[in-house]
Amino acid sequence: MIKWPWKVQESAHQTALPWQEALSIPLLTGLTEQEQSKLVTLAERFLQQKRLVPLQGFELDSLRSCRIALLFCLPVLELGLEWLDGFHEVLIYPAPFVVDDEWEDDIGLVHNQRIVQSGQSWQQGPIVLNWLDIQDSFDASGFNLIIHEVAHKLDTRNGDRASGVPFIPLREVAGWEHDLHAAMNNIQEEIELVGENAASIDAYAASDPAECFAVLSEYFFSAPELFAPRFPSLWQRFCQFYQQDPLQRLHRANDTDSFSATNVH
């Protein structure tokens, strides 16, 4: 179900959205009750402000809408929903989609090619996603399409183009750039050693700073146990920027699981 901004008051009294069910995905397991409540509040506002547009026969129901909204709002849980200003629509294909890509080489020749995309984020336009990869974003694997595209949106708030440096105090920019490029170099060294497919972190992170920030944002929220020990200095910068500590959440979730296991009779 799509909630339209001009129908908020009308629909709010008619349909109770399945937030409790929507929260029951591995990615959100470690959230406290207070964090869950805050996230749902943001997600409700997100659905009031943004238009979710299903394409090519994709069917969008209330549970899917809620989970999409929760994933959009997780990165801005402490930053605030205003950090997601600048776009009003989320276009959702049923599967990865084909786009016409145009690029210019080093000698000025323009090339055209058709490529398959999982998602796209335009600075002053919609975010484009696909449901197959959204579904794969519910677990804690290090892959999260929505967080990746949200990171690009957060990145561009700092200037005209994504640079890998989000909107942080000027005094912190040099340190951020140093740690981000060090991470890129480290990932590239691993790729050269074991190959892209065997690398422990998505090789796309080594392609440029903007993609490194987006990819590591995926790992920050969905695989903190891989990010934090490998890049501790950059991890602290991400914690400071997002004002969250997903590794602490992971430990809390694991402690809860251990306690439950020891009390099974």
Curated annotation (Swiss-Prot):
Binding positions for Zn(2+)? Answer: 111, 148, 152, 211
Enzyme class label = hydrolase
One GO cellular component term, please give it.
cytosol
- Free-text remark on how the cofactor is bound: Binds 1 zinc ion per subunit.
The catalytic activity of this protein is classed by the Enzyme Commission as 3.4.11.-
The protein's matches in SUPFAM superfamilies, at most eight in alphabetical order, are given as: Metalloproteases ('zincins'), catalytic domain (SSF55486)
Cofactor(s) for this UniProt protein: Zn(2+)
Under Pfam families, the record lists:
Peptidase_M90
* Biological processes per GO annotation: proteolysis
- State the name under which the record lists this protein: Mlc titration factor A
Q: What is the lineage of its organism?
A: Bacteria, Pseudomonadati, Pseudomonadota, Gammaproteobacteria, Enterobacterales
This protein's gene is called: mtfA
